[in-house]
């Protein structure tokens, strides 16, 4: 089971939802920035959960609206959710950054190309930090458990900015010594 499973089951633990409603909630909480999940994945997951007995489905129709399938978490699903909460809270903290693959291979590039990649990484860190900084004031009214993730990401990006500045200085120093 993955963090995606934990997020989807957690959402269904709060209240029954359709796959579409789950996807919209993931988007509205900006969770798609932190986990890779698409609408087809959500649909595929709820079908898997139903086959495993974690959720039950019910097709409902409201007025003139088209039918939709609502998913409700079962006792077994709640048990799995609770087990995953413990499992993930005990897991080793790992930080995966796609740009680390660029850093590892940077020695294979000429200086100009390497500098361009560094500038791209720097811009990406700064842009993401700015986006989160803009969101923080507007999210003061959301519950602590959601707001704290934004704050965590902002602090991590500040640390990455410092790391990137150090990396540039060390690289410049290494180039001077050659």
Tell me the role of every PLM-derived stretch.
Residues 146-178:
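Long, low-complexity, charge-rich intrinsically disordered regions
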Residues 82-127:
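Amphipathic alpha-helical dimerization/coiled-coil segments
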Residues 132-151:
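Acidic interhelical loop/turn segments
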Residues 14, 44, 120, 152-155, ...:
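DHp/HisKA dimerization-phosphoacceptor four-helix bundle of two-component histidine kinases
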Residues 125-136, 157, 164:
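Non-transmembrane amphipathic alpha-helical segments
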Residues 106, 135-140, 171, 175:
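Secondary-structure edge/capping motif, primarily at the C-terminal ends of alpha-helices
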Residues 1-92:
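Basic helix-turn-helix/winged-helix DNA-binding cores
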């Amino acid at each position: 089971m993955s963090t995606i499973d934990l997020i989807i089951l957690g959402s269904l633990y709060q209240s029954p939802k359709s796959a579409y409603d789950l996807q919209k909630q993931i988007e509205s909480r900006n969770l798609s920035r932190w986990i890779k999940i698409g609408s087809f994945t959500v649909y595929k997951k709820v079908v898997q959960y139903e086959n495993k007995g974690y959720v039950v489905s019910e097709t409902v129709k409201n007025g003139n609206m088209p039918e939709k399938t609502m998913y409700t978490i079962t006792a077994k699903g709640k048990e799995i959710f609770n087990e995953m909460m413990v499992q993930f809270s005990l897991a080793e903290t790992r930080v995966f950054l796609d740009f680390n693959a660029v850093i590892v291979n940077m020695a294979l590039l000429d200086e100009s190309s390497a500098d361009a990649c560094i500038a791209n990484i720097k811009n990406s860190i700064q842009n993401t930090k700015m986006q989160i900084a803009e969101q923080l004031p507007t999210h003061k009214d959301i519950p602590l458990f959601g707001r704290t993730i934004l704050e965590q990401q902002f602090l991590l990006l500040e640390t990455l900015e410092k790391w990137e500045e150090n990396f540039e200085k060390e690289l410049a120093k290494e180039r001077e010594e050659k």
